[in-house]
Amino acid sequence: MGQKVNPIGLRLGINKNWNSRWYADKSYRSMLYEDLKIRGYLKKKLYHAGISHIDIERAVNKAKVNIYAARPGIIIGKKGAEIEKLKKELENVSSSEIIINILEVRKPEIDAQLVAENIATQLERRVAFRRAMKKCVLTALKFGAKGIRVSCSGRLGGAEMSRTEWYREGRVPLHTLRADIDSGFTEAKTAYGQIGIKVLIFHGEVLPGRKELEKP
């Protein structure tokens, strides 16, 4: 089962936390839809800033949006001008007052989502898929990952029949619940169609009585 299920969803409450942290009763549907709109809007607008993930915490009529980015300077802008502009745009999408918090991803080379997006960018630039996969795998190990698995699925190399190819180095123990595994997925839009890229990175084990591993 560990091979099939999302590794982050499987570890919620063990060594992973929810990306949306709020409670709603009758307004659950509208708030969930708001979260999806906020995430979709930010991902599209701030793609070049290297967005790893977005956490949303809600209180009464307030929503705190934590944006984890590899290049926070692009989001903040000169003297924080871009932040204010972004806040107003998000308040048009949401019915709550928005508080934006930008957090830097210090090691984007071992962040699964950013690695997947890096491979996607290379594929869109017509880099050979095996070369792109291998380069990212070796870079992740160099920056301290204990293990990494990358898989690409689609019309690889312009082949007529779609297939899946994967590359793994080190350990990626999907059945071990105490293992700190990061997961990322994106799609590359190539001339031959879409190619799905999935990345799993193993950062080490979170042992009982020990604090959660420091995030990249």
UniProtKB/Swiss-Prot annotation:
Domain KH type-2 as annotated: residue spans: 38-106
Q: Name one GO biological process term.
A: translation
One GO location term (cellular component): cytosolic small ribosomal subunit
Q: Which InterPro entries match?
A: KH_dom, KH_dom-like_a/b, KH_dom_type_2, KH_sf_prok-type, Ribosomal_S3_C_sf, Ribosomal_uS3_bac-typ, Ribosomal_uS3_C, Ribosomal_uS3_CS
Q: Which GO terms describe its molecular function?
A: mRNA binding; rRNA binding; structural constituent of ribosome
Which SUPFAM superfamilies does the record match to this protein?
Prokaryotic type KH domain (KH-domain type II), Ribosomal protein S3 C-terminal domain
Q: Which CDD domains match?
A: KH-II_30S_S3
Question: Which UniProt keywords are given for this protein, alphabetically ordered?
Answer: Ribonucleoprotein, Ribosomal protein, RNA-binding, rRNA-binding
Say what the protein does: Binds the lower part of the 30S subunit head. Binds mRNA in the 70S ribosome, positioning it for translation.
Membership in a protein family: Belongs to the universal ribosomal protein uS3 family.
Under the subunit heading, UniProt states:
Part of the 30S ribosomal subunit. Forms a tight complex with proteins S10 and S14.
Q: Which NCBIfam families match?
A: rpsC_bact
Output this protein's name.
Small ribosomal subunit protein uS3
Q: Which organism is it from?
A: Syntrophus aciditrophicus (strain SB)
Q: What is the lineage of its organism?
A: Bacteria, Pseudomonadati, Thermodesulfobacteriota, Syntrophia, Syntrophales
Q: Which gene encodes it?
A: rpsC
